[in-house]
């Protein structure tokens, strides 16, 4: 059936069709090659915005540092990072005056978190800069490596498993004259292959000990590794993002915990809530402004955009904010929170992989690592790269660039939101002391500003005052990219408001379709996405029904599981036809086994195996869900699993879907090619780590293992737990005497082995 798309819009107001203009269908652009150029851009731009600041040299690392705080007040509209410290402190004081006790209470909440958080909090997150190997690793591996190095250097506070004790080790490590680390390296040898008699390169992985002096260690500890941000839609140029190492992460986590606690209490903050809760919060602020602007007042809203938010923020500013927020708090607490901004004031940006050169004539390729950029002859580079390198050279140390000003993306989202809200807070009439007043919403660098005044001149004056106040704390509202409208129509964090929020359905488009996990999960995720969009995003019944039919079609093409009686010939159709013919109750077959689709918009919440169970032949049931069938997934059956879905905007969301283990919930194996690379040693470490953690969780279901288990090691804890459990099971008659004594014997053997080691 062909539809003329223009007909769809005849009865729609333009705002409701906004979502069709978004660049969200199709694959997003990915970056290839090195991010070195983008990182140099960031470093150079950040310094340019603060160029009138004071230069100093870090006594420990010798890095040149630029401090723009209390720099000259701006004379034009160019973005600048010259925040005035007294202005920031005053904004904080007024914020506290409007919300009595807010800082005090948040500090108390945070203090509790600080004392309870376990070091395993740092294992969350995919890529983390691993300073021991000088490259990115999964967070769990990077943490394990760091703790291992600390331990071999006599730092043992972290054995107790509290994050705060790990951070004590980090502080101590910075005072050490040198650190000994273990690095992986690979040797290449040319050997003759016995089978083919050809020469092949054989790689072996070795571990070697290396000593790092205080200066080099500090540089590594303060380094943020950089990568290119992938999958950004609607941009022509890519940009660099940073991933900090384990030394910085824990401190940042506590600062963000404090800031999050403050944001939760601020009605203008778009963080940390999301989804419908966020929409409700925003609608409240708009309602307040519109009710107050009765017939006498005009009300306008700016859909705001800030120029280079991160690059104009300054860690020194955040230090001042934290010092103010934690006044009257215990010394240890103030110290632990001030470390993150201090480390960021001294941060180094790693320039990434460097540049790749190739000669067409000689068919040669060579990599110029970032470390060489300081000394290489610039005649090899093109004009723009040459300029970048010349500019960054004074800042380079060991392949990293000193980057004192600026924040790097996504590090202090909550704290910078507090700063933004403190300026919105100054819009109350008691502070503006005139006829105009403002309020608004802030979520990291995105804001919406609502200004009320008796006439247009007042609105203009209010906007100007807001603009200038922002400049004083290093926030640069972009006059080119912000636009103003009568209140009632604006956009904030990709929510479009028109007398209420319009569903921006296109944002969800990328998450429709077949995920490619396995037949069982894909079916479940597919219908859950449709269900969720009916609940949250105005997906109407007719469209949902159509989405469902398209999904089933897509699913059948992906897994080549067309109906059993189809004429389509695929590699699977021969087997599926046989199954179809020998099945009595054909309605009971899974869609992925050539069965019919029984889903409609009323039963999307039911897993397929439950939906069809009563309709299945008995032997089909027996094959699908029999734990003795080697193809049934042997993971414990959890009622829900988490899938990662990619909305078009913002980070990947985790979405729950029902998981029932059947023969279709298989798990694909890891790609073998990694086993031949230098990553292999790391992979083995990671698997060991994974196995130990899984084993530990078997002994201590999550409820009991989150709490500190005293000073005993993991093995001791597991052995004693095994003994207790075995005794209980034996006394209650769940296990026989022979089994009980066997368990006890194994426990003793393990302890014996530990003693010998």
Curated annotation (Swiss-Prot):
Modification after translation: Phosphorylated by host PRKCA.
Compositional bias (Polar residues): 55-64
Region described as Disordered: spans on this chain: 50-81
Pfam name, any one: Flu_PB1
An annotated Gene Ontology molecular function: RNA-directed RNA polymerase activity
Domain RdRp catalytic: 286-483
Catalysed reactions listed for this entry: RNA(n) + a ribonucleoside 5'-triphosphate = RNA(n+1) + diphosphate
Biological process, per Gene Ontology: DNA-templated transcription; symbiont-mediated suppression of host gene expression; symbiont-mediated suppression of host mRNA transcription via inhibition of RNA polymerase II activity; viral RNA genome replication; viral transcription
GO CC field: host cell cytoplasm; host cell nucleus
Keywords: Eukaryotic host gene expression shutoff by virus, Eukaryotic host transcription shutoff by virus, Host cytoplasm, Host gene expression shutoff by virus, Host nucleus, Host-virus interaction, Inhibition of host RNA polymerase II by virus, Nucleotide-binding, Nucleotidyltransferase, Phosphoprotein, RNA-directed RNA polymerase, Transferase, Viral RNA replication, Viral transcription
Enzyme class: transferase
Tagged with keyword Cytoplasm: no
Top-level taxon of the source organism: Viruses
Motif (Nuclear localization signal): 187-195, 203-216
Compartments, as annotated in UniProt: Host nucleus; Host cytoplasm
Main location: host cell
Chain residue ranges for the region called Promoter-binding site: 249-256
The keyword 4Fe-4S belongs to this UniProt entry's keyword annotation: no
Stored HAMAP family: INFV_RDRP
Family named by the database record: Belongs to the influenza viruses polymerase PB1 family.
Protein name stated in the entry: RNA-directed RNA polymerase catalytic subunit
Gene name of the record: PB1
